[in-house]
């Protein structure tokens, strides 16, 4: 059965764009139903279950042909699905809430791709920032989103600090370079599954602090979204998509090296080339976060959504 949740959003422009028809040659002879999936970014470890299911033929087994699209703007996973220009988007729980509450955009989540948070406050080892208290007097870089501002403010308050005890600096997409060049002491918005292993691969020691261990309510990071209309009209197709995706998850869990191999086959080498060592660590991290006790892969908790809606209201991220 299709589980739907929906009440969410950095709308900064990026240079991402394009699409990839990733169906195999054997699918040409079959009568397959196309499903367009808009990613949050170029292919990376977060998408391993999707690409594994494609390469292993699980979608074809469900009568589906997957067309992966890369976003031209960072919120395309929501804007394109809500407008009926794509079937499914790969995006973030908080952005779904924001889209519904602040912009009245009719999108819903149909499944949790990564149950646990991956967004962390990170710093290089030589800064010796290991607790929120260590942020006093420090500069924290972020991508300009209201959500990450709320994360930092909540963490500071939870540690007994004032908002102005640390300085927030908008560094755009330069989360890693802003730290390595010394522009800031720490950043919020980077992923434990991407920026952390990437920096470690460059030879840096990385410390990170989890927002959900410092005042921010537990939340689901990555979800599959669609329009409310599509969820109602095409429940069977969406259910088949999720069923095949779960097969991909189970296969990667049993064969992580093969999962990495299938991901690397689908990398966008021109715009976002992947490093095997980094993605191996990334996939291992994603596997450890994709589900948790009482919350198997793809399942959704109404309590988790409700708690985060309340927190977003309390912090002013949403207004209704």
What are these regions (language model features)?
Residues 8-11:
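Bacterial signal peptide processing site
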Residues 58, 64, 161, 204, ...:
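Helix N-cap/coil-helix junction residues
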Residues 46, 55, 74-77, 92-95, ...:
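Stable alpha-helical elements in mature extracytoplasmic
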Residues 15-170, 181, 185-193, 209:
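Short, glycine-/small- and polar/acidic-enriched structural segments
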Residues 3-6:
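C-terminal motif of bacterial Sec signal peptides marking the signal peptidase cleavage site
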Residues 67, 75, 213, 277-284:
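Short linear loop/turn motifs
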Residues 233-317:
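Secondary-structure end/capping motifs
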């Amino acid at each position: 059965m299709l589980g739907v949740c929906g009440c969410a959003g950095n709308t900064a422009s990026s240079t991402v764009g394009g699409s990839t028809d990733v169906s195999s040659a054997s699918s040409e002879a079959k009568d397959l139903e196309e499903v367009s999936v808009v990613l949050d970014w170029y292919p990376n470890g977060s998408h391993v279950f999707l690409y594994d299911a494609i390469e292993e033929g699980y979608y074809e087994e469900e009568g589906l042909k997957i067309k992966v699209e890369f976003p031209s703007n960072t919120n395309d996973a929501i804007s394109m699905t809500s407008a009926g220009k794509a079937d499914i988007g790969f995006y973030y729980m908080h952005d779904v809430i924001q889209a519904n509450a602040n912009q009245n955009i009719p999108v819903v989540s149909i499944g949790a791709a990564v149950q646990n948070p991956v967004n962390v406050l990170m710093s290089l080892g030589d800064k010796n920032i290991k607790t929120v208290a260590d942020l006093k007097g420090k500069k924290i870089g972020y991508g300009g989103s209201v959500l990450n501002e709320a994360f930092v403010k909540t963490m500071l308050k939870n540690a007994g600090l004032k908002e102005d005890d640390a300085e927030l600096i908008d560094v755009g997409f330069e989360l890693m370079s802003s730290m390595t060049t010394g522009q800031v002491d720490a950043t919020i918005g980077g992923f434990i599954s991407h920026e952390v292993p990437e920096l470690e691969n460059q030879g840096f020691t990385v410390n990170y602090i989890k927002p959900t261990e410092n005042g921010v309510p537990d939340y689901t990071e990555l979800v599959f979204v669609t329009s409310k209309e599509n969820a109602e009209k095409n429940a069977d197709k969406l259910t088949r998509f999720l069923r095949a995706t779960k097969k991909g998850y189970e296969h990667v869990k049993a064969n992580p090296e093969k999962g990495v191999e299938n991901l690397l086959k689908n990398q966008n080498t021109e715009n976002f080339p992947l490093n095997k060592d980094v993605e191996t660590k990334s996939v291992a991290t994603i596997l450890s976060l994709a589900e948790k006790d009482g919350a198997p892969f793809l399942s959704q908790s109404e309590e988790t959504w409700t708690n985060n809606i309340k927190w977003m209201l309390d912090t002013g991220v949403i207004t209704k």
